[in-house]
Structures are given as C-alpha cells and as structure tokens.
Amino acid sequence: GAEIRPSSKFFFMPNCVTNKLSIRGTDNQIEQILSAIAEKEKTDAISRSPIDFNNIIPMPADLNVESGSRGHQGLEYIIGLSKSESREEVCKTWDSLTQEEKDNRLLFGAKYFTNTMRYGFPTWYEWRTQNWGTKWNACNASKSGNIIFFGTAWSTPEPIIKALSVKY
C-alpha cells in the first residue's frame, strides 16, 4: 500500500511549523492521494493548494463563525455559565453597549450554543485545534513530485497525518 511519511521543522517564527509530507506508493496511488487532498474550490491549478485539511477531516460549515469574546459572552448569558459572574452581573457589563451590540452578542451566543450541542464545539477555532491539531488550514503549500511542503500554526497537524495514514 501507499505510505504517508510526515516530517516537521520549526520556522524562525515561533508560531509557524514547516511540514514536509512525503507520499510513497505506485504512481497511481500517489496521484490518487494527491488528487484527493488537493484544494477543490479554486478552478485554476496554479493557485490551488496541494493540500486542504477539509478534504481529509472535513469541518462542519456551521462552525465557520467568528471566534471571540462577543460569542462567548452571549453564550455565558444564554446558559448562565459565567464562572465569575451571575447572569445579572453579565448583563450589567452590557449596559454601555448599543442594542445592536447586545443583539449581536446574543446571536453569536445562540450560534455557539447550537454548534456546541450539535458538534461539541462552538466555533471553528475549538474544533480545528482538536480535530486538526492546529488552528488554521495548511498555508504556503507547494508540491514537488510526491512531496508537499506546507505551513501550520503552532504544531504539526497530527490528526490530519493520522487520518491520511489510516485511509491510505
């Protein structure tokens, strides 16, 4: 069968990891894997990334929502889970907000709640770090024959590599 062989090297920047993914097998197996993991959304092959984590472990589209304090504050209000404040105290901090800002917090909070109930995570951020091992998709990717070089934030995307190894 085909063999997936990862290696990682840290960039000079502490946040970035350079990954080298070597794919071994027959020419047909290699082409099948490269085709399966390549970005599909862009139509021209030149700008298309040779690796898209969504083609390996797809993230539910509903999770593609802003990750930030607005949503977490709205969620705390909705379910009353603020660790340090009661619902009333949370609302007091909202006194300086416009009605539109309050509504946005509640909308984000409701979305976070729905996502957590459905997927176990409120946003893309929590889901990706758990399921991909990194917060962003592959970046600055290039391909040379059966080798793909790509960057990731913070760490090697071990769940992605494992999923590829299991599948192929």
Predicted feature locations:
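Long, contiguous binding/interaction regions
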Residues: 9-168
